[in-house]
Amino acid sequence: MRAIETYKTIKTGLFQDETLFLYCYIAHNGLKYETTGATLDICRKSRDIWLSHLSASFTGHRQVISCRQTAERVKDAIRYCYKNGIRFFYAGGAVGFDTIAAEAVLSLKEELTDIVLIIVVPFPGQDKYFKMENKKRYMNIFNRADEVVTVSGSFSNIAYLKRNDYMISHSCQLIAYWDGKSLGGTSYTVRKALDKKLPIYNLYKNRL
């Protein structure tokens, strides 16, 4: 199911000279959010805040120790977040932990029927230089995701950071696979989450 956004306007005020937006958003899993605002932008920002309180993001290294064990740890983390009200999960679609996490969400859809997978890509064709096996896994999660968000129209190093910023700004929790030392996109995202004071569940070496 695709998310559906509808709205209409009415005239308000003593002289009927003010416009009020009556806004309704139905998410991919059927959850409904309604609000009113003076502009459509105000309504959408209010919706995004509501969604962020129901959302978690993933970040992690491309090299993963014991992929099968890590996948089970991710599933446990998803179930834990689900029990605490999380329904939307954002993944970046990169090789390694991102792919494992996205596949874990998809594998739990029969068990947790209202969870939503949103893939956030830095630019179109980020899989261009993936190895064939990784490309196949990427296209599988890309095609099965409930939504795909593209943050930039073309390749740039900044696009990767914009992707990470987008996920953090739309989430209230972070599920990470971070060794605590390495620099790069995972470290950047964890530090952004720390700055925002988000709960972080680090699955590296069985930590949750």
Give the residues covered by each predicted segment:
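Short, solvent-exposed loop/turn segments that connect beta-strands within catalytic domains
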Residues: 15-19, 30, 112-114
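A short, exposed loop/beta-hairpin motif centered on an aromatic-Gly-Thr core
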Residues: 28-42
